[in-house]
């Protein structure tokens, strides 16, 4: 079953992205490098 997740910037704490994942196949937390519009650089975003 797919669930909606929010990706939170690790440096400023803003919730910048909404995504979905399959909890059955990927139970671990998502971490990805994304663009943060507040800081205007690419930063690490984690599932929140």
Swiss-Prot record:
Listed A to Z, the keywords are: Ribonucleoprotein, Ribosomal protein
GO BP = translation
Entry GO terms, CC: cytoplasm; ribonucleoprotein complex; ribosome
Any one Gene Ontology molecular-function term assigned to this protein's record: structural constituent of ribosome
Q: Per UniProt, what is one Pfam family of this protein?
A: Ribosomal_L33
User: Which cysteines are cross-linked by disulfides?
Assistant: none
The domain of life for this entry's organism is Bacteria
Note whether Ribonucleoprotein occurs among the keywords.
yes
Family, as annotated: Belongs to the bacterial ribosomal protein bL33 family.
**Protein name (Swiss-Prot/TrEMBL):** Large ribosomal subunit protein bL33A
